[in-house]
């Protein structure tokens, strides 16, 4: 089993009034980036997840443009401190599998076992992501 490190940060915000909450997610991720400094990202409905390597604060100059492009009353965000898988953009979260976007905080100890339940989920040391395995499994059950 991999060595467990500090956890990531997962943020979810939903506006009942339809207000664009993407700027609030930026603020939350920036405030909590000490929980994960490898990568960050967020997802809104009907768009691919937005992900970047590095600190949230290093992208401050882009926030206004990104917030307009991804404007939404519903957002999930994540800062990554990897416990499994390499620090690549592909492993940054949120991840999207079909219509499901997911962000996860923690380690799934039996990820290899779960990956055997979902055919076609390639689980290798290079792209090992317990979150991807969980997403694939959830999608297979829906």
Predicted segment positions?
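Conserved short alpha-helical segments that host acidic/polar catalytic motifs at enzyme active sites
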Residues: 1-142
